[in-house]
Amino acid sequence: MTAEQAINEGAFSLAASFGFVPLEYRGYEAEVLASKETAYIGTALNGAMSPIYDVTGPDALEFLRSVCINSFRGFQVGQIRHAVLCNDKGQILTDGVVARIDEDTYRTYWLAPALEYRLINSGLDVKGEDQSSNEFFFQLAGPRSLEVLEAAAHEDLHDIAFGRHRMSTIAGIPVRILRLGMAGGLAYEVHGAAADTETAYRAIWEAGQPFGLVKQGLNAYLMQHTEAGFPNINLHYPLPWYEDPDMAAFFDTRPTQNFYNKYRFFYGSVGPDAEARFVTPYQIGLGKMVDFNHDFIGKEALQREAEADHWAAVTLVWNEDDVADVVASKYRGRDVEPYDKIDDRPFDIYHNLGQPGFAYHADWVLADGERIGTSTGRINSVYYRRMISLGFIDKRHAAEGTELTVLWGRPGTPQKEIRVTVGRYPYFDLEKNNAIDVASIPRPALDVSAGA
């Protein structure tokens, strides 16, 4: 990918080893609001940045069941499933999406290289193939996203239900359209051959102009998960890839995919303890996915956790006066050491570390001074005009309206207890993708005069 391609036109980009990653086009505020008001097209996960891995063979489904917490019961061609892999401790090794694209072919997203490691050691009649550089990956979301896609495809796509996918064409190019997304509301993905990336992107972009389509960069994309209540790998928590020597040796052979967890930098009051940052499905609200009616790696540990019934995932709404005090600490003169910055980023993601690696931010959540969990994924919610984060906390303190504090600041620096209130979860309170009836949405493919 080059900076001259359509995806990068008008973008402020981050240079990565595999190409340019657009960070912002019109500014993250406008790009975030597009998911609520019109529609966006995003490429944050396009190209080599996203691990795409096919699992094929007679034992493909048996293999997936053996390594995932969900059983894939009733999983049909044309469906999509969320999948989570754990280690023996029940800690999440990765989570992502599986699309069944043929009888014995399952295309996975963000499950490799952990999935590949498990496959190589499975002893089953199953094969794996890396597709990461072979497929483009566009995300569209917002109330007019379906209209945009139909205008580009010249086809009625209303039949694609939530969690489903099927083939279509855009500009004469075969594409797979999936109905899912991280923004909370109506959302789709468009996948196709990497060689057709620019042609497909330009066709969608041009078709979307009458509907107010906005280009979305990585910064706006990273702000969606907290608001929509989707805890995400490499955003809300790191993965225990390098705590197992055999696994670590394997990941070292995948240098383009081990980036997020080989060289970790830890920010926030939780400090350098990686174990305090690793999570289980129950901590982050995914316990409902666990199916104990099949054997899988981590089952015994998760059974113990299910019995303990200790954790809850919540939204934390930050007190604006306490946040303002952290900002004000920068302006109290040279004799006062300020708190860690909270105002120079819309979230706690650090792009420019000056060295290889990836940064994770987590803060302790306190109840009457006692640690009850962690806060991660802090964002400035543009739509709701609040600062919020996700909390993985003791469920005894998880009732909406409960007042807690977040300890802000790295160990050894000035720290402040910021008041937070447990809010609704997810914080996104508009109509959700899985509940939207698209029947009332216009069909541009059937109306050549369609416009805004």
From Swiss-Prot:
Top-tier EC class: transferase
Induction / repression: Expression is induced in the presence of sesamin.
Thermal dependence of function as given in the entry: Optimum temperature is below 40 degrees Celsius.
Coiled coil (residue ranges): none
One function term, GO molecular function aspect: transferase activity
EC nos: 2.1.5.1
InterPro entries, alphabetized: GCV_T_N, GcvT/YgfZ/DmdA, GcvT/YgfZ_C, TrmE/GcvT_dom1
Result of changing Y221A: Loss of activity
Catalytic activity line of the entry: (+)-sesamin + (6S)-5,6,7,8-tetrahydrofolyl-(gamma-L-Glu)(n) = (+)-sesamin monocatechol + (6R)-5,10-methylenetetrahydrofolyl-(gamma-L-Glu)(n); (+)-sesamin monocatechol + (6S)-5,6,7,8-tetrahydrofolyl-(gamma-L-Glu)(n) = (+)-sesamin dicatechol + (6R)-5,10-methylenetetrahydrofolyl-(gamma-L-Glu)(n)
pH dependence per the entry: Optimum pH is 7.5-8.5.
Assembly description: Homotrimer.
Annotated function: Converts sesamin into sesamin mono- and di-catechol. Catalyzes a ring cleavage to transfer the methylene group to tetrahydrofolate (THF). Also active with (+)-episesamin, (-)-asarinin, sesaminol, (+)-sesamolin and piperine.
Family: Belongs to the GcvT family.
Protein's name in the database: Sesamin methylene transferase
